[in-house]
Amino acid sequence: MTLLSPGIENKEINLASAIGRAATGRAAMVGKFEWGPAYSITQVTSESDLVTIFGRPNDYTAASFMTANNFLKYGNDLRLVRICDATTAQNATPLYNAVEYTIGASNGCVVGDDITITYSGVGALTAKGKVLEVDAGNNNAASKIFLPSAEIVAAAKSDGNYPSVGTITLQPTQGDIALTNIEIIDTGSVYFPNIELAFDALTAIETEGGALKYADLIEKQGFPRLSARYVGDFGDAISVEIINYADYQTAFAFAAGHTLGDIELPIYPDGGTRSINLSSYFTFGPSNSNQYAVIVRVSGEVEEAFIVSTNPGDKDVNGQSIFIDEYFENSGSAYITAIAEGWKTESGAYNFGGGSDANAGADDWMFGLDMLSDPEVLYTNLVIAGNAAAEEVSIASTVQKYAIDSVGNVRQDCVVFVSPPQSLIVNKQAGTAVANIQGWRTGIDPTNGQAVVDNLNVSTTYAVIDGNYKYQYDKYNDRNRWVPLAGDIAGLCAYTDQVSQPWMSPAGFNRGQIKGVNRLAVDLRRAHRDALYQIGINPVVGFAGQGFVLYGDKTATQQASAFDRINVRRLFNLLKKAISDAAKYRLFELNDEFTRSSFKSEIDAYLTNIQDLGGVYDFRVVCDETNNPGSVIDRNEFVASIYVKPAKSINFITLNFVATSTDADFAEIIG
């Protein structure tokens, strides 16, 4: 402000700005996992994180899981996007194997009465149904019933009708009930890829003339709106026990012959009961009739126990909200989610089923990769796409080519790591495997000159291709698996950043040692390596007593230039990121001599440090009136030109051994 009377005004101006070092070891990957949020970017820093968030490997997910885990053996910052097929994926729910029905003629029923169920060819079933609601204005006709499903499902599968059923007749204790349109629900009946979309999915109801939605079906069964937190058949192992305030108090009331904490819960939708002791899981229980004790089991083992409430104002002893909607939205459970709407007041145990996440196609991989394409949303400099190589050749080629074209070439600040399709190289003779890789890489089969439709015929400096597979032990399933090497090659880049600098090559005996290899798919001899290296494929080779080594550092370009090496590509990615971040602070400043010279000084200082560390041989920065003439200034532009002589890695070593006579003069020979 302007002083209007004598005084002192302090102003602070910062002229000490500098260019900071950009992170270089962050990787991103899209893949198939058995658990975890789908189509959401999640940070993973360790194998423990990976297992906790995304589950363990199985035959469907092993390539993605082990590729991600292999990267984490070298680096510690991985951003993952789980994919699934939205048309077939399902969250597991208590609706699976519940009996869906339409009540026809009914009268004279009483709420709470048992229902005897008779199945054609089987007779009366052991488990009894229950009348849940009646319509007093319609002769006490039953409007909602519960039918325990375990015996019905078994009978339907036995007679080959499942998910349809044979003839079922019902006889309540009082009155009559006749059913039509009886079916067994054979899916989870709801899909949401991540928790942000859960509420809408759990509240959606039937549109006029449309099929019943999850909310309609769950309400009809009389169940609370519960679901597995994520899609996938891992959710089928979940079981949830809910105990209301009154039953919790009764469980801890003194009574002859009663063990404190014991309670018996009806099981839905199967039927039967389950006995548990609450004192094993809770130190305090529900404090009012709005609150419920919840126990979550996975494969029968208790994983979580907590208190939730249907009242939006309720909090726990730490002041955190336990309102059902907020509790689950805020990651209160790692396994389930629920909403307060439609919550049931009765206690019960609910078995989940119907989860699915199989059949992800190339389109699903592409949707996931699209989430990595915007550098303003996510900064990453290593993109792993080679886990898709375990898919069939057409998907492997399409997905990896898309990763290069739509992520690497669009962002131009990262390197995409790809691997050859597994079926082309695993269990093949070396000559056949090399020919297969050549055909895939060039689009021309070298054995007959025919076009190869599913190929990786691209030329770019923003991709790196490896040329082998490793046979690796899967400790989670006690077996060995063939795994693509893209995660390891990206990991070597992160490891190189840790022990050296990004502009150093990740290949060779010093920094290129591949971990966790039992054996390689192909033993690449010199002739094989020569053939692959000429088309930009980096061999991975086993040397007796010296480990398994990345034995090449080319990018995927077919043009001879400085950028045909990984270290130069990564050097320039680093420079572009760091200097462009600093350039943001010149936006909306004046294009004058002070702005230009200060920016040039920052770049000079930054590049001098890079030069001192061996990243560049020399550089020159031009940011003055020669490239910022009046015409540039009048267009509100600002131009800086940065010339760099990048350091080159050694790929070929020549050792000249010369024998001379005993009295030869080296000065004369060498000069």
Curated annotation (Swiss-Prot):
Supply the Gene3D superfamilies for this chain. Answer: 2.40.10.380, 3.30.1490.450, 3.40.50.11780
Q: Name one GO cellular component term.
A: host cell cytoplasm
Q: List all disulphide bridges recorded for this chain.
A: none
Its main localization is virion
Biological-process GO terms, alphabetical:
symbiont genome ejection through host cell envelope, contractile tail mechanism
What InterPro entries does this protein map onto?
Answer: Gp18-like_dom_I, Gp18_domIII_N, Phage_sheath-like_beta, Phage_sheath_subtilisin, Phage_Tail_Sheath_Structural, Tail_sheath_C
Membrane as a keyword of this entry, yes or no, is: no
Which keywords does UniProt give here?
A: Host cytoplasm, Viral contractile tail ejection system, Viral genome ejection through host cell envelope, Viral penetration into host cytoplasm, Viral tail protein, Viral tail sheath protein, Virion, Virus entry into host cell
What is the annotated localization of this protein? Virion; Host cytoplasm
Subunit structure, briefly? Homomultimer.
Q: What does this protein do?
A: Polymerizes as an extended structure around the baseplate-tail tube complex. During ejection, the sheath shifts to a contracted form, thereby making the inner tail tube protrude through the host cell envelope.
Provide the family line.
Belongs to the myoviridae tail sheath protein family.
Annotated protein name in UniProt: Tail sheath protein
Q: What is the lineage of its organism?
A: Viruses, Duplodnaviria, Heunggongvirae, Uroviricota, Caudoviricetes
